[in-house]
Curated annotation (Swiss-Prot):
GO terms for cellular component: mitochondrial membrane; respiratory chain complex I
Family indicated by similarity: Belongs to the complex I subunit 3 family.
Protein's recorded name: NADH-ubiquinone oxidoreductase chain 3
Enzyme class: translocase
Keyword presence, Ion transport: no
UniProt source species: Strongylocentrotus purpuratus
Major place of residence: mitochondrion
Length: 116
């Protein structure tokens, strides 16, 4: 119990010292050159805040979801050594049907088309 109290008091002391040091140190003002983007010594050609394509975002999310689902299929051959086929085959078929229905749904809604 004394070890916990000792570690807790050291943690509080370090937090107090860091807080006092943050208030004691002078505030540094930033100038325009420090806050401007650096691009290999040249002035930036375009704005750094370009709008992001929502279509690209959706395709990236779809890729991650399908990639995760495919990664969940990898342990099925190893599970066939432990689980009887009468249990494993229906589970894997349900999983494949869900994966296929998701693909068909995205295909019908146009989520896989890059250009309109």
């Amino acid at each position: 119990m004394t070890t916990i109290i000792f570690l807790f008091s050291i943690t509080i002391a370090v937090a107090v010292v860091l807080g006092l040091a943050a208030h004691a140190l002078p505030n540094r003002t930033s100038d325009s050159e420090k806050s401007s983007p650096y691009e290999c010594g040249f002035d930036p050609l375009n704005s750094a805040r370009l709008p992001f394509s929502f279509r690209f975002f959706l395709v990236a999310i779809l890729f991650l979801l399908f990639d995760l689902e495919i990664a969940l299929l990898f342990p099925l051959p190893a599970a066939s050594l432990i689980t009887p086929p009468s249990t494993l085959i229906p589970i894997s078929m349900v999983f494949m049907v869900i994966l296929t229905l998701g693909l068909v749904f995205e295909w019908i809604n146009g989520g896989l088309e890059w250009a309109e």
